[in-house]
Amino acid sequence: MINKYYNLGKNILFPINRSITGKGIIKTLKIFKKIHPKLKIKYFKSGKKVFDWIIPSEWNVKNAYVLDQEGKKIIDFKKNNLHLMGYSIPVNKKVSKKELLDKLFSSQKVKNAIPYVTSYYKKNWGFCVSKNHKNEINKKYKKDERFKILIDSNFKKNGNMPIGEYVIQGESKQEILISTYVCHPSMANNELSGPLLSMMLIDYFKKYKLNKTLRFIFVPETIGSIAYIHQNEKKMKNIIAAFNLTCVGDQRSFSCMLSKSENAPSDHALISTFKKLKIKFKKFHFTKRGSDERQF
């Protein structure tokens, strides 16, 4: 089973340009549905208000690159989809070297890595490169050189935001929620590891007759879980424990973030399991970090 999902992630899912909306996340959920046909794909309309949030317009991108004066591509979205800042607006113009450098995002901590940057709720554009790459551009080109910017993206105001849901019905109405998010592009640990682990858990638990109902959801981070809660407030009352699976694919020690009270059934189940299996782990307070744990 592990090899099956490892190969799925590496060869099929990793190259897909995912975001909180758009063709990439829909394609990913449809791949999951082929494996588990009972998985339901549900859609939330762009512009819909969920609590005090608004579902954003659907974003898609065909191409994006930067050309130097000689017509050479120095940044190419098609070589690595992390090069384009997520939700970049359409751009087709020439800019100065200073303007270009101001629009290049890089990481000071890991100088050979391309950072993941988004601008979901503010109109903006930009490219992401390693710090080393940015330094090379700054060193190679003269102050007065100009660069061609192309971002072939579009926004659909009448678009959709998809989520995936898979329920394994138990004998009890009480539920355990397992959430993960599917909105990141080519990043293995954050976040293909969570969805792939959820798929493996579905494979495992669907073979058994369960006491509690298991509800798996695959959502865009933050806005997806908020929209899901907004639509399913009554169902959420049946949930007695919830887990959010994220960044479970690296070689560091296990870590967990407990509930606000640190006294929920999920807290006791998690801590006791770690101790029983003699697994070393780090514990984080609810206010210190988190992704969709904040919502649930």
Q: Where are the regions a protein language model picked out?
A:
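N-terminal hydrophobic/helix-forming segments and targeting peptides
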Residues: M1-Q295
